[in-house]
Amino acid sequence: MEEIQRYLQPDRSQQHNFLYPLIFQEYIYALAHDHGLNRNRSILLENPGYNNKLSFLIVKRLITRMYQQNHFLISTNDSNKNSFLGCNKSLYSQMISEGFAFIVEIPFSLRLISSLSSFEGKKIFKSHNLRSIHSTFPFLEDNFSHLNYVLDILIPYPVHLEILVQTLRYWVKDASSLHLLRFFLHEYWNLNSLITSKKPGYSFSKKNQRFFFFLYNSYVYECESTFVFLRNQSSHLRSTSFGALLERIYFYGKIERLVEVFAKDFQVTLWLFKDPFMHYVRYQGKSILASKGTFLLMNKWKFYLVNFWQCHFYLCFHTGRIHINQLSNHSRDFMGYLSSVRLNPSMVRSQMLENSFLINNAIKKFDTLVPIIPLIGSLAKGNFCTVLGHPISKPVWSDLSDSDIIDRFGRICRNLFHYYSGSSKKKTLYRIKYILRLSCARTLARKHKSTVRTFLKRSGSELLEEFLTSEEQVLSLTFPRASSSLWGVYRSRIWYLDIFCINDLANYQ
């Protein structure tokens, strides 16, 4: 980020958002490669025969070609082979578009720095902790017990490429850059090959995914502007959780305020945050809108959103992409968690003189549970257990050393505990831990051609101490024990900021 600021100094005010000249600079392509945002799939890499090194020679020739008059535009009638570069036209376009993707991200990056500085008093957070998945943590921490209905929205995709260009007009005021963007989209790409909607979310072609993910995220940000306006209008206090680049940075402020309050040894639950009218979050091409309104009100919201997106964004959108579910009757499959609102019954005996009464109270509680059936299915797919959850050995790992086998099983177990540490009930995790531990023992016994009992008796129980690390010891390495009440909060539910995905359990083959 420092490199970007060095090339965009404030004294160049006349060139604010004037990004087109940067595409002729070699350092832009070096920064796009060195920042590692697309390190594993960078099109600026040589062919496999050249040891995957950055080809500055191709970049140099490309920039020289762009400087030449009337040679930048490539006619669609040209052959696929470009004699000057020695590569096909698709690679020629991808090289420019990757550098262009890095350039158009500059205004957003500077805006993010400005937003973070004003929010936390000039404190800049590391970019790897600003992933979109972190929006799910404060979303699950919100009070859902009073909410009634949830709208499941499948985010529409643009039906015309010009919509993507128009979305950036408010951010990039450089007409030349917008014309270049329009040239890429209309000359080199076909919408049917860019976006495929066979799955619930969206997937892009493997060619230069970073460029099109940036365009898609910018487009989705504009769609979400509706919820930002409605949220601010419906709240008594001005919301600070829907600023620039919403759903990214505000978990920090929330956890710091929790620490600040509980460190003072308050023994009561405080409503630290206002009770909003709507709760909104987006994930995997979907979005969820929870509200405490009636079914009639949610149905009006549904048709309002459909009409708004159709008229304002010219989207091919129909009501079947929005489903209304009652929160108390449906469990939400949300980012690997099974979330639901259930009633906790409690019975109180009260006695007045000679008469006694039984009072039944039902309190709503929002639970984030570990889905046991999908997890056992993943373990069965990875040959750790049967479909019924009975542990079995993993023969493909029997050729490894004992330490490698234990390390692999232990890594899977730690990752699962790490990811599902925010669950309100961890009983399921200990069942998964038992399956992995016994599967590890059977794999080791298979390797040494003995039974599990004989192997453990000969090797000792210390061999599997990898699975005996208590949750409290892991948490003590992450959070200081500021007070007893604060430690009680940490023991119940913890959200780790270094999580950005959960990998398939069958990765190790």
Swiss-Prot record:
Pfam families tied to this protein: Intron_maturas2, MatK_N
Signal peptide: none
This protein's encoding gene: matK
Name used for this protein in its record: Maturase K
InterPro entries recorded: Domain_X, Maturase_MatK, Maturase_MatK_N
Summary of the function given for this chain in its UniProt record: Usually encoded in the trnK tRNA gene intron. Probably assists in splicing its own and other chloroplast group II introns.
Subcellular location: Plastid, Chloroplast
GO biological process terms, semicolon-separated: mRNA processing; RNA splicing; tRNA processing
A GO term from the CC aspect: chloroplast
Main location: plastid
